[in-house]
Amino acid sequence: MAKVIGIDLGTTNSCLAISENGQTKVIENAEGARTTPSVIAYLDGGEILVGAPAKRQAVTNAKNTIYAAKRLIGHKFEDKEVQRDIESMPFEIIKANNGDAWVKAQGKELSPPQISAEVLRKMKEAAEAYLGEKVTEAVITVPAYFNDSQRQATKDAGRIAGLDVKRIINEPTAAALAFGMDKGDNKDRKVAVYDLGGGTFDISIIEIANLDGDKQFEVLATNGDTFLGGEDFDQRLIDYIIDEFKKEQGIDLKQDVMALQRLKEAAEKAKIELSSGQQTEINLPYITMDATGPKHLAMKITRAKFESLVEDLIARSIEPCRTALKDAGLSTGDIDDVILVGGQSRMPKVQEAVKAFFGKEPRKDVNPDEAVAVGAAIQGEVLSGGRSDVLLLDVTPLSLGIETMGGVMTKLIQKNTTIPTKASQVFSTAEDNQSAVTIHVLQGERERASANKSLGQFNLGDIAPAPRGMPQIEVTFDIDANGILHVSAKDKGTGKAANITIQGSSGLSEEEIERMVKDAEANAEEDKKLTELVASRNQAEALIHSVKKSLADYGDKLDAAEKEKIEAALKEAEEAVKGDDKTAIDAKAEALGTASQKLGEMVYAQAQAEAQAGESEQANASAKKDDDVVDADFEEVKDDKK
């Protein structure tokens, strides 16, 4: 059976793994490294360098050295994220004929799938060198929050590289697979996979269940940001260095392509060093020059300074965690393990933020650079028939539907629905003798069609003349295991059908997604606040009742000052529950809880003292009995009669 390799196609670095006979191995590339920089260089003579060799020559060939191409995949040139990247990238990003964001290098116009294919080809060659046989099939991972066109573009990249992509799987799911299969126990567990990579962020809540020796990995919910990652952290540091240098020297390094490339390398190195040290120094001699001569850059960066520069980026990663937990119907206390994936998750401040949110230390036994590729390789072995003890149940990240009469979106598939899935619904015409209908496919959470993301549209014609509402048009949405959407429409009267596979549409920005969800939830927010207020009030009243009872039973055992303190806290809590301020109720209940805790300790101490007194009486009674017992003296007698 042909081997199906697992590839983590990352924004900054990529990784390759193979699973055979239940054993998974990360494969080194031609340079002997376990990860490959996702950097591609186009040279004058037509030669293409990939990985470390491309990265090494980037300073002298900045305009033709492409990195972070994954950030452009499936995006339109006009997208604001692409426009933001244009300002900071040393290479040229152009608008393709179809409106997509492409790259220009050595005079050639290149699509992001084309560029990514070079990295995949290098992975393929490394696998073939290791196995000693031809490799044609692969499982490739993508961010969980990638949309249909981004997934399709990733499959296209595989095809360009000569690979039949058997499955596209989500990066957090792959990491959970690697983690779950590595655990020898059969314990059911819920894990949160926090995946902060080079260019994208995902959070997935996954349940790992043991089913008669087999393991089922079910994604309960997923969320994320396709434009948040280590590249953004690097950029914050680069911008800071540029600003400081401009203040000192009056020269803007943004205008110098070669200086930008040197700054990028220095910033990435400094960021990594600050994960283990408290301070690092950036030294870039001859960074630029003016009429007075060459200029040198020397700057000390502390960990605290770097953390302050990226504080908001870290905070941006926490909100999707909150949403994913809510969508999964869980609280932080329900999570058994927190797994960190992606190189940027090594940053201590990131780990602190994750620990603070989930209330538990993230696992340190998962390799953040390799776990995703390992999971992809395990899925590859499953697909090749090499193992059958694993079942993956992934989800679609956003709701999908069509525009119907009145400009509303009718959802056929809800967000976080397990895939593959299929849903059909019968619609009809809006006017008498209508001969054609336009099926407008949408993605999002809003009721109003125009407020959602348009994924594409197609027409179904030759509908037999009939009064409005009579024709029966069945629309079917089919999402395959790769998360790619296929839509079809069929006139049940004539059997006429039309269909579309969603591809080539631009990606969704995090802001668009957040706005869709927030707008849809706006009405539900007030109800939620009321429910939370009632819950807080009930908890506070239960505590008030409990403390009052304890005071009545044990108040005489407290000193006056302690009793007065508790009574004051009681009075404040009773006043708070009369109002509608949830924060005040919670605060006063907490204060009362602290005061009543001391009361509880005294009650416990009193009960313990009484118990000890009882034991002491028993001991005395026992000793009195012992006074009546006569101790016998024994003498050793030697028996000589043998």
UniProtKB/Swiss-Prot annotation:
Induction remarks: By stress conditions e.g. heat shock.
GO molecular function terms attached to this record: ATP binding; ATP-dependent protein folding chaperone; unfolded protein binding
Biased amino acid composition, Acidic residues: 628-642
InterPro entries assigned to the protein according to its UniProt record, in alphabetical order: ATPase_NBD, Chaperone_DnaK, Heat_shock_70_CS, HSP70_C_sf, HSP70_peptide-bd_sf, Hsp_70_fam
Alphabetical UniProt keywords: ATP-binding, Chaperone, Nucleotide-binding, Phosphoprotein, Stress response
Modified sites of kind Phosphothreonine: T200
Ranges of biased composition (kind: Low complexity): 608-622
Chain segments carrying region Disordered: 608-642
Superkingdom of the source species: Bacteria
Keyword Ion transport: no
PANTHER family reported for this sequence: HEAT SHOCK PROTEIN 70KDA
Role summary: Acts as a chaperone.
Family: Belongs to the heat shock protein 70 family.
Name this protein carries in UniProt: Chaperone protein DnaK
Organism: Neisseria meningitidis serogroup C (strain 053442)
Gene designation per UniProt: dnaK
